[in-house]
């Protein structure tokens, strides 16, 4: 999933592709989440961080996530035909959008109880994802989140205030994709 971000961009080039066109892709890059089995989880996505949380929800329900102490690619083994486990934890999904231009709502509802916050109140709770958590009296032991930096900072503070574990995935622009050019460096203390 992607959004065309302007003229002359890579996303515009993607939008012009048709079935059968060939492209070279480097990925996936980065690290996934190590899921804590048995802990009630919030899966929280905002903006470009929404789609990765759908895949995490699917993986949790299929039992193909990496859990503490497992080998790094154990989830991949399950996807390639190993025995499929059951869901590793209960979860509530909370998604944040600017306005009514939401996406993937039906797909999230197929995975778990799903809640929406929009900045303008056009869908779900008016405000941010924390407002949706409070309005719906949701509780969890751990947060897995992906999205814009202000949302991640707020969730980190919320987790500390509620004595919860919090794992975040930062979606930042990256040039080379492997860390060589240092364009993707994020100061973790700023999150």
Residue positions per predicted region:
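Short, Lys/Arg- and Gly-enriched loop/turn segments at beta-strand edges
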Residues: 10, 30-39
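Short glycine/serine/threonine-rich phosphate/pyrophosphate-binding segments
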Residues: 50-56, 151-154
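Generic structural signal for buried aliphatic residues
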Residues: 22-25
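Extended interfacial segments that mediate partner engagement and assembly in macromolecular machines
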Residues: 28-30, 42, 47-53
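Intrinsically disordered, low-complexity terminal tails and inter-domain linkers enriched
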Residues: 62-89
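Short, charged beta-turn/beta-strand-edge "cap" motif at the junction between a beta-strand
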Residues: 27-32, 190
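Reductase modules of NAD(P)H-dependent flavoproteins
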Residues: 75, 80, 94-191
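Ferredoxin-reductase
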Residues: 1-19
């Amino acid at each position: 999933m992607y959004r065309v971000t302007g003229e002359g961009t890579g996303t515009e080039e993607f939008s012009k592709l048709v079935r059968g066109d060939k492209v070279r892709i480097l990925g996936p890059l980065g690290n996934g989440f190590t899921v804590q089995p048995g802990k009630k989880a919030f899966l929280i996505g905002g903006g470009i961080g929404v789609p990765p949380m759908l895949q995490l929800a699917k993986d949790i329900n299929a039992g193909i996530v990496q859990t503490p102490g497992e080998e790094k690619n154990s989830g991949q083994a399950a996807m390639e035909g190993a025995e499929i486990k059951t869901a590793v934890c209960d979860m509530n999904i909370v998604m944040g959008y600017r306005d009514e231009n939401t996406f993937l709502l039906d797909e999230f509802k197929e995975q778990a109880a799903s809640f929406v916050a929009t900045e303008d109140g056009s869908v779900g709770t008016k405000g941010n994802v924390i407002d949706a958590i409070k309005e719906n009296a949701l509780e969890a032991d751990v947060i897995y989140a992906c999205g814009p930096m202000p949302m991640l900072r707020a969730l980190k503070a919320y987790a500390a205030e509620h004595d919860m574990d919090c794992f975040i995935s930062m979606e930042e622009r990256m040039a080379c994709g492997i860390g060589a050019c240092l364009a993707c460096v994020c100061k973790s203390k700023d999150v």
